[in-house]
Structure formats: C-alpha cells, structure tokens
Amino acid sequence: MKKYKILLFVIVMSCISNVYMWGTTKPLSKNRIDLFSLSEVRITDKYFKHIQDLDHQYLLTLEPDRLLSWFRREAGLTPKAQPYPFWESEDVWGGGPLAGHILGFYMSSMSMMYQTTNDKMILDRLNYIVNELLLCQKAHGDGYLLATVNGKQVFEDMIDGDFTTSNPLINQTWEPVYIMNKIMLGLYGVYKRCHIQDAKRILMGMADWFGYEVLDKLNHEN
C-alpha cells in the first residue's frame, strides 16, 4: 500500500509540474494582427478627411427624437417627433415600416465617429438616445425593447406556432430579430467605444428577454 501511495504522489506531482510548465510556455510566433482603437488613427489625407467631415456633419443633422419615435410609441409613450419617411414609416414590401433599424446603424456610426473625432456633441447625443431607450425599456417592464409595430405580438405568435414566413416577413411584419440585432450591435458599440454604462444595461436586458421569453419557449417544430 505504501508503494502505491508513493506512486500516486509521484504521478500527481508530475501532472502539476506539467500543468505549470504548459501554463508558462511562450508561443513560438508573435501575433500577426494587432488590434487598435479608432482613437489611435487620424486621417491626414485631404480628400479622405473631407469625406470624414461630411459624414460627421451628416450624422449630426439627424434628429434623435425622430429616430426614437417608434420606440416610444411601442412602449406606450408619446412620441416627441414624427419618424423619418420612407422605410422608417411607410409600407415596405407588404410588411409595414422597417421601424427602428436606422437607429441601430446610427448608434454604431456615431460611436465610431466619436472615437475618431472625440466630439463631445456626439457623446451628448448618444447619452440622450441611451437615456430615452432606457425609459422605453422600463416602460415595457420586462427587458423588451423594439420599434417593430406589434413586435412583441409577433414573437408570441411565433412561440405559439401561429405564424407564416415569406422572407423577410413573418406574419406580414418585418422580421423583428433583424432589427433587434441592429439595435443590440449599436448599443454594444456605444458601450465599448463611448463607455456609456446604461447602453450595456439595456443590451443585457434585451438579451435576457430574448433568451428567457423567446428561445427558452421555442420547441424544435417552431
């Protein structure tokens, strides 16, 4: 028995030694790609700087309250402004408006422009948008946040198996997960690039709602 104990001790110590050695082993080659922030890059070429300035100016011409209009409406709050025309408020391919998707792209673009220019006006505007989205999410009361017209009902019908699809529509409504994806990506960019903590809070609430209220309730047939 004593011999077995000694053998077991030697094996254990050998394993610990190997783990330690593996943990301190250095890679044979260096990383071929080094990631860097947009804040570390500045455009000096006259032509490209002009294009960046035009983008910067255009982003600031868009009105947050118009981009937020459908979010407030779907949350039961009074919109502060009418939504933008065309895809944001008119019928698109028989699925109604593609409400809310522009705000997702807008948040992504604004967060990147902030890293590039450090313009405080952009940061102030993003803080306003995040605060408004947080109000909408709180009004729903369960983490849900979307501008899709009757979006929550679409998810409920899908869970019940009462739906038809005709890409990109579901129950004659623009597929809400697409729009949710754009909003979540925008919030992620705002959190990572601008360090606005409430953007992360909203994002986590949306993810929890989708996980618990949609994915957990779906079966293989759905």
Question: What label would you give each PLM region?
Answer:
Residues 22-222:
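Glycan-recognition and catalytic cores of secretory/periplasmic carbohydrate-active enzymes
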Residues 1-25:
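Bacterial Sec-dependent N-terminal signal peptides
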